[in-house]
């Protein structure tokens, strides 16, 4: 079955059984670069500058505009820019190459352009108006990356928590061993009162701390962008009015730290996903993909350090079809619609599965998982569809990350459906991208680690200066 966009035709070897129009970004890019090899190329360089002065550069080649295929080139680079923004982040984008490409990107990523959400988000996170600099390839600044160690502190009595859109997890950990773990359902995205968020987090911490002889430190992970323990932007708090967000939510974890009187660190949930993977695998680099309410993603490099990148792959594209599934914030064909409970629900509904109207996504997933345990053939195809997404998605991520280990976890991978996702993703890599399959492994953690490993890894985030004796 051939699929076409912007004059580029792709022929996937494996079709998602319940989403046959899925057009993998990895296949589009491969076919485009075959075209580059056939008709000639010019260099194109992109670089993103962060608030700390770090520079992250990305190099590729495109067909010269005079040789045609401009529509495909513009699509490729616009999608690449969007991916890099959500992978690496930054307030200034350098586009070095053909002027037609640079000016197109500048118009799209503007306050009134098609990517105005991305423009506004980056401006907010980095507290500086987003800027696009159109220049030559030679004038693009080289990479100057900053990395830092993260967590791995296993001493003492700790609480770790993980805040998701549908549940909050917490673990009590003594010298690296979990002595208590639990999950509590909550609904933060519809809670406009900051006190709901405060009380929920404190409840999880206190319930876990009750299983410890003392509390030495607290570590947390949560969806969104957190800098120095302050919330910058996060979908968990989307219902909180901006004024209250600035007054109550931004300093929320600083308040909790001061009230508890112990060291506390809170970071993006994706970074802890990668940390959990690195700790369980004992190897690096690791890309962690947590398929939960949305997609949480994080990356640990070959040195075992985080990079300072955003790694918000929920908002990064993986599908190049026109009029594909929409993320309510970031637009078309992003990771949140392919690697999450949202994806499961989208595919299930499109396949004709019916649910009680008022049933939430977490409860729908539970019903789907129960049907999978009963051997439902349609549900098996649903999981094969998600697994196909994962396989082609990992191949695309390999264009942007140095990969060795990819760990998939989260509520969507719970139960026998998780094994189907894993096996199908490996099948896609072996059949379509054998060169990647030979060097990159995709794995699931064990069932217990899969559900609560995030909060246990989060507990290791803070260093304890002195352990009480």
Predicted regions, residues:
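Short, active-site-adjacent cap segments at secondary-structure transitions
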Residues: 100-103, 224-229, 272-274, 296-297, ...
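Short acidic/His/Gly/Ser-rich catalytic and metal-binding motifs that mark active-site loops
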Residues: 179-182, 226-232
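Phosphate-binding/catalytic loop of phosphoryl-transfer enzymes
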Residues: 153, 219, 228-333, 455-469
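ATP-binding/phosphotransfer module of carbohydrate and carboxylate kinases, centering on a glycine-rich
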Residues: 1-185, 190-216, 262, 280, ...
